[in-house]
């Protein structure tokens, strides 16, 4: 219910911004599709590297992903709506349009670094506060956060990063199997990535 409230709040607060940025998507839909596709390919490759690191460390049990998998197994439709539609909208408006967009005016590398770090911490902090060894899972969210910033910047519209975020989460949700097994999906829940 918190994501439903946050989605409604963002739509009411930033509806004009979303509408204005939608024009850029309508002007160049092919560019958006290509950028999202290239970004997803880069996400997939970076995910292979991150999973390799986590396998080497024997740390494949990301508690955020585990929580989303458990919720999805109990209520797939609602969790799908939350992770594929609500979370990308809310999180992209916060981390890309808000933090990244504001800081980019002053210092582009700092904008990338701060947005990436805050997005990554957002997804794992609750679990890491209870068990500090869970901070390692931040590495699963850093690459996708970089790519979401890149997609936002290259598309010159928040809809580019929203589209990429939706794709990452949709594929991650698809990977959740009824038996509770999941493919490597660091972006599941809360997004993503």
What is each model feature region?
Residues 1-2, 11-14, 54, 62, ...:
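Short, structured coil/loop segments at alpha-helix boundaries
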Residues 8, 12, 40-47, 145-149:
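Alpha-helical transmembrane segments
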Residues 18-87, 182-190:
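Juxtamembrane helix-loop-helix connectors linking adjacent transmembrane helices
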